[in-house]
Amino acid sequence: MDIQQFRGKSVDDLKAHLIELRKEQFSMRMQVAMGQFQKTHEIRRVRRNIARVKYLLSWINRTPA
């Protein structure tokens, strides 16, 4: 997802999406360890989406409402 798509979401949606992304990342890491995962570029995509969501959550908490 693009950061613009994340900006339209609420804090609760972002937190839920972050949990989903972390589960997906864990699953991918386990598949890589077992040698079953071939699309390694997906790991990078998930890692960057996690960073985007974490940035937005910290930005929201930092700015006064």
UniProtKB/Swiss-Prot annotation:
The keyword Coiled coil does not apply. NCBIfam families: L29. One of its GO terms (biological process) is translation. The keyword Glycosyltransferase does not apply. Keywords: Ribonucleoprotein, Ribosomal protein. This is Large ribosomal subunit protein uL29. GO terms for cellular component: cytosolic large ribosomal subunit. It holds the Pfam family Ribosomal_L29. It comes from Xylella fastidiosa (strain Temecula1 / ATCC 700964).
